[in-house]
Amino acid sequence: MSNLAQFDSDFYQSNFTIDNQEQSGNDSNAYGNLYGSRKQQAGEQPQPASFVPSEMLMSSGYAGQFFQPASNSDYYSQSPYIDSFDEEPPLLEELGIHFDHIWQKTLTVLNPMKPVDGSIMNETDLTGPILFCVALGATLLLAGKVQFGYVYGMSAIGCLVIHALLNLMSSSGVSYGCVASVLGYCLLPMVILSGCAMFFSLQGIFGIMSSLVIIGWCSLSASKIFIAALHMEGQQLLVAYPCAILYGLFALLTIF
């Protein structure tokens, strides 16, 4: 038993005493007081304000409503996009549609005895010819004749043939758009004839004579414009002959 007691005393031997325990307790209390004082000082210090740019501080205060942002008139007045938008041409002018030019060419066709200014065909205009082709098909439809396909088909083939003939006959070449523009504008008298077919039949002496007059009117106007635009003096009859054949086909559609 004495050996066992000696073993226990040797096994549990330590340098720890009651004085050391009291000293460690005092150290922990001092550390707690120091931590609490630092926490209290940190709580008493004011929090740093959020960062605000100098531009926002210098700008004027907002006076509008929440969902209605204040407009900056200086930005819109100095914006280059507003000025460029105001300087843009109208939409019809960008598309190449000029009603004064259309009216001038229409008057030239309606008065074949008037001298023709060749410069009117320097600008290729297809707005008037398309309108007259649609008007011819519409008047034939109102007269009980559905001939839209024939009108468009003969117009395209006739323009190709006369374009080839004029390039062979003239020293200066001519564009396909110019030929289509002239032939389309000169289709206006044929539209008048098809409009008359809506009210009375043209299958008679009066209808045949009226058709001959309209064919001569269309071919004379077209040949005069081609001669003036291409400087083909002395060749008007040679140009008027294929034009008369083309407009004769349109007259046959109108009568029958």
UniProtKB/Swiss-Prot annotation:
It is a multi-pass membrane protein. Residues 1-125, 169-172, 218-235 are cytoplasmic. The lineage of its organism: Eukaryota, Metazoa, Chordata, Craniata, Vertebrata. Keywords: Endoplasmic reticulum, Golgi apparatus, Membrane, Transmembrane, Transmembrane helix. The gene is YIPF7. Pfam families: Yip1 (PF04893). It comes from the Eukaryota. GO terms for biological process: endoplasmic reticulum to Golgi vesicle-mediated transport; vesicle fusion with Golgi apparatus. The keyword Endoplasmic reticulum applies. It is found in: Endoplasmic reticulum membrane; Golgi apparatus, cis-Golgi network membrane; Golgi apparatus, trans-Golgi network membrane. The keyword Nuclease does not apply. InterPro entries: Yip1/4-like, Yip1_dom. Residues 18-31, 38-48 have a biased composition (Polar residues). This is Protein YIPF7. Disulfide bonds: none annotated. The chain crosses the membrane at residues 126-146, 148-168, 173-193, 197-217, 236-256. Its main location: endoplasmic reticulum. GO terms for cellular component: cis-Golgi network; endoplasmic reticulum membrane; endoplasmic reticulum-Golgi intermediate compartment; trans-Golgi network. Signal peptide: none annotated.
